[in-house]
A protein has these predicted regions:
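A generic signature of intrinsically disordered, low-complexity regions enriched in glycine/proline
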Residues: 12-13, 243
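C-terminal motif of bacterial Sec signal peptides marking the signal peptidase cleavage site
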Residues: 20-23
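Hydrophobic helical h-region of N-terminal Sec-dependent signal peptides
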Residues: 14-18
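Acidic/His-rich structured neighborhood in mature extracellular/periplasmic domains
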Residues: 93-244
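N-terminal mature-domain "stem" immediately C-terminal to a signal peptide or N-terminal signal-anchor/transmembrane
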Residues: 25-94
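Bacterial N-terminal signal peptides that target proteins for export
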Residues: 2-12
Length: 244
């Protein structure tokens, strides 16, 4: 299981600059027939905020309906302590009733319509299809959107990919500078970058960078491979997004 904030660094920049000389001429995979994929789609941000009042029954039902995500969301994404269903329902109600969280949710609803989320799921399914074409298996079965309270942009597990929509509200969103995110980072916090971040996040979940091996060249090679993987999985992606 992996959690990712949005990462943009000098190693990726330099390695991708070296790759750009052939990228436009040699984008792989563009003409292959799509492989069939089977996925479920969960707009958990809508599920969570649609309840008038969160009850223990909601907690039990969500835990049973979404076993691949609910406990992960509660314990790892919004960091609520372990509790019984009654106490957890109370904690979740406090979360969705918090003024700041309500403001974030309102902005998410403004930026992302339900149709926008469907389009996002479709784009990720193309990535999964390309992955299956190249590597023979479909990596995950569940695609999820959620509100993370600015904790995570992308999460991956052995069965799911999730997107924290509140990390993609646009570079003009006033929330980001107010919580100390630097401008060079939040200038990429828009929906245009979601698919790229999902693919890069998945690559990082399968290929950890060696933290003990901090040589400049080694990291350039790592991020160059990540760039190439992303270009294979999304051959139509604009270079400005790939290198962002």
């Amino acid at each position: 299981m992996k959690f990712f904030t949005v990462r943009h660094n000098v190693y990726l920049l330099l390695s991708t600059v070296l790759m750009l000389s052939f990228s436009c001429q040699n984008r792989p995979n563009a003409d292959k027939q799509p492989a069939e994929t089977m996925t479920t789609h969960l707009k958990f941000d809508e599920v969570l905020f649609s309840a008038d009042s969160i009850s223990p029954l909601h907690v039990v039902n969500w835990s049973q309906q979404y076993p691949y995500f609910f406990n992960l969301f509660v314990n790892k994404i919004i960091h609520l302590p372990p509790a019984d269903s009654a106490a957890l329902a109370l904690s979740l109600q406090k979360f969705v009733s918090d003024k700041d969280v309500k403001d974030i949710h309102a902005r998410v609803e403004k930026v992302f319509s339900s149709a926008d989320k469907d389009k996002l799921f479709s784009e990720i399914e193309v990535f999964l299809s390309n992955y299956k074409n190249e590597l023979g298996t479909q990596p995950v079965k569940h695609l999820i959107t959620f509100l993370s309270a600015f904790n995570y942009a992308v999460i991956t597990s052995d069965s799911a990919i999730g997107i924290g929509l509140d990390m993609y509200l646009g570079s003009d969103c006033e929330f980001y500078p107010s919580i100390g995110i630097p401008q060079y980072a939040y200038q990429h916090f828009s929906k245009d970058y979601i698919l790229c971040d999902v693919i890069k996040g998945w690559y990082q979940s399968e290929h950890d960078v060696d933290e003990e091996k901090n040589e400049f060249l080694s990291r350039m090679i790592y991020y160059g491979k990540q760039w190439y993987f992303t270009s294979v999985m999304a051959p139509q992606m604009q270079d400005t997004i790939l290198t962002g």
